Regions:
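Conserved nucleotide-binding/hydrolysis micro-motifs of P-loop NTPases
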Residues: 4-7, 16, 56-59, 84-87, ...
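Short glycine/proline- and charge-enriched loop/turn segments
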Residues: 16-22, 94, 132-142
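Short, basic, glycine/proline-bearing loop/turn elements
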Residues: 48-53, 94, 127-136
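Phosphate-binding/switch region of NTP-binding enzymes
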Residues: 99-170
């Protein structure tokens, strides 16, 4: 994760897996059933093959090197990036940030093919969605992907999280 550090990410993972509020876990405000569930789920997670790298400003080159090693040595079967726009393209100079994000996107596509594993890259949306009206207006579109038109071209699949209740639209 490029957005959260290891501790934050692990805390969120534990909260999600245990289905217990992160606030309750951090404050130790759990009832007996929740303590038992936390204990049981932590034992399961302890041996899970999950590797987190929170290197800030990770470049595509650094990611490729680390991913190759993890696939070779640990048998990693999925690579997740949180999130694409926090990466950089190996210190290369670009005319715009859009060109750089496009290069990053193409590099991730190449990495997925090279390693023969899926690469799931999260992306930020532009603010355009916030300015549109109504239920359909708030639904994210491919053109809302921030800083690149290449993401939609490079991706095998693009999924959006859309919560109408967030906008009080039912």
């Amino acid at each position: 994760s490029l957005e959260m550090n290891n501790v934050q990410l692990v805390n969120r993972l534990i909260s999600n897996v245990c289905e217990i509020s992160g606030h309750k876990i951090l404050n130790g405000q759990l009832d007996n059933t929740e303590w038992e569930r936390l204990d049981r789920k932590l034992r399961d997670l302890t041996g899970a093959p999950i590797y987190v790298d929170d290197t800030p400003g990770l470049s595509v080159f650094e990611l490729r090197t680390k991913a190759r090693r993890l696939v070779r040595e640990k048998g990693v079967k999925l690579l997740m990036i949180d999130y694409l726009q926090l990466m950089n393209a190996n210190g290369m100079k670009f005319g715009s940030r859009q060109e750089e994000v496009s290069t990053i996107s193409r590099s991730l596509k190449g990495l997925a093919k090279e390693l023969n594993i899926p690469v799931l890259a999260l992306s930020q949306l532009s603010r355009n969605v916030e300015n549109r009206e109504g239920l359909e207006g708030k639904r994210p579109q491919l053109s809302d992907l921030r800083e690149s038109g290449a993401i939609e071209q490079d991706a095998d699949m693009v999924l959006f999280v859309h919560r109408p209740e967030y906008y009080h639209i039912y």
